[in-house]
Design a protein with these regions (language model features):
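Domain-level signal for soluble alpha/beta catalytic cores
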Residues: 1-274
Length: 274
């Protein structure tokens, strides 16, 4: 595990840590076209990225994610941008770090930057072609850039397999920053690759994660169920519950969720008290 963990320190002080909302969904509202990689906005439209960060901080987020979810070489290769991993992730972390500085200057409240690391989109051997060594190198390139840009923690998210979590965690640890990893669980109480919340809790201990939890999924109720499964394992690490506001639907040229702000506020209180 890493040394100092600012998220754990914040939880010890406040009792909880409030994270941000849906970065991608907010970008759609600002003109991002479906299929276009939001990571490129870190350099093309930094003012839009900064505005979303500022809005989350103004809403009370203690921690927020960088605009780098798909910022690894394998994902960026789909857009002929695999050679831009370093510059895009450094920019993502710098934009977020600058937002924390602006917020502190006006409010005196300290907030944290979580360097978002999403999945590669590839299957691991024997089901696919990606092996552990290759995956570690892909994730290391991104993790090092996020650390260089000023991330406080590295946030591995929306994973489905322990193999990919292991590779991303190994890579992230080379930075010396605290590492969080979250899986996405479905209605069967397991990830797409069959990992249960309790399995994941034990795995998190085995690979010495600093934080773990669940994110995304199909809605807050199901996410709370996964969170309870992790907590029931008796794990002593900070537990993350960061769900969708329901199932996203494409309507009238935009992404909509069937949940509401009130629903998410209630879910946040339930998650705090699990």
């Amino acid at each position: 595990m890493g040394g100092s963990n600012p998220v754990a320190d914040l939880i010890a002080d406040k009792g909880w840590c409030v994270a941000d909302g849906a970065t991608g969904s907010n970008f759609f509202g600002r003109g991002l076209e479906a299929g276009y990689p939001p990571e490129l906005w870190c350099l093309e439209k930094p003012e839009e990225v900064a505005a979303v960060h500022d809005a989350f901080l103004h809403a009370g987020a203690d921690l927020f994610l960088t605009n780098s979810f798909g910022g690894n070489a394998l994902r960026l290769k789909l857009h002929a941008s695999e050679h831009r991993v370093a510059e895009l992730n450094i920019a993502a972390a710098q934009l977020a770090s600058e937002a924390t500085q602006r917020h502190f200057a006006t409010t005196g409240r300290k907030t944290l930057v979580a360097g978002s690391i999403g999945p590669t989109g590839e299957l691991f051997v024997p089901m696919g072609m990606l092996d552990h060594r290759q995956a570690v190198e892909v994730f290391r390139e991104q993790a090092m850039a996020l650390a260089e840009g000023g991330a406080d923690v590295l946030w591995i998210e929306t994973m489905s397999s322990t193999e990919e979590v292991a590779a991303a965690t190994e890579a992230a640890k080379t930075t010396g920053l605290p590492v969080c990893a979250t899986l996405s669980f479905d209605t069967a109480r397991c990830s797409m690759m069959g990992v249960t919340p309790m399995d994941f809790a034990q795995f998190a201990v085995d690979i010495e994660l600093d934080m773990l939890g669940s994110n995304c999924g199909i809605g807050p109720a199901e996410l709370l169920d996964s969170t309870q499964g992790i907590v029931a394992s008796g794990i002593a690490l900070p537990v993350v519950a960061k769900g969708n506001c329901g199932i996203p639907q494409y309507m009238d040229g935009a992404i909509h969720f069937h949940g509401s702000p009130d629903l998410m506020a209630q879910y946040a209180l339930f998650a705090r008290d699990v």
